[in-house]
């Protein structure tokens, strides 16, 4: 009887350990793509909430966030519980960085989106309060030209009204792009995003 209880306790402990292992984790930061496995890319202007979204999907803080734009300046790689790769790219369009740093970030982004990269889909994140900017349109055109599947994530919808959200959806419709209104902070519509990541 004691041996039987011990056996079941060991099985229970083993399953708990396996479940603990199956969580999101940070892998590494690189100036270029250092993995050949299929991956989902998150890109957007500085301070739109890319890192916050990674944390919301992971249900824990694995990506460093800051109220100051320009925190992410390398490719940050993560792996989820299903062993899928996610890439948090540097934010573009932040004016308060040196010209040298800006060129460096541009090179990292351009280098990542080469046509031979193993990218399953790109998620371009907007601040829903601001909407599309000229830089966003340029980035959208570039990603499409490179042949990658593109989705628009309008983040921070918890800080917008119905009229603003309707305008965003109409703009996406004109661009013929799939658009999902989300809030990384409140986790609004994250379940729908999870479906896109399957």
UniProtKB/Swiss-Prot annotation:
Disulfide-linked positions: none
An example Gene Ontology molecular-function term: GTP binding
Residues the record lists as binding Mg(2+): 51, 72
InterPro entries according to UniProt: G_ENGB_dom, GTP-bd, GTP-bd_ribosome_bio_YsxC, P-loop_NTPase, Small_GTP-bd
Protein keywords: Cell cycle, Cell division, GTP-binding, Magnesium, Metal-binding, Nucleotide-binding, Septation
A single BP term in Gene Ontology: division septum assembly
One GO CC annotation: cytosol
A Pfam family per the record: MMR_HSR1
Cofactor section: Mg(2+)
Binding site for GTP: 44-51, 70-74, 88-91, 155-158, 182-184
Keyword Nucleotide-binding tagged: yes
Family statement: Belongs to the TRAFAC class TrmE-Era-EngA-EngB-Septin-like GTPase superfamily. EngB GTPase family.
UniProt function note: Necessary for normal cell division and for the maintenance of normal septation.
Name this protein carries in UniProt: Probable GTP-binding protein EngB
Organism: Mesomycoplasma hyopneumoniae (strain 7448)
Lineage: Bacteria, Bacillati, Mycoplasmatota, Mycoplasmoidales, Metamycoplasmataceae
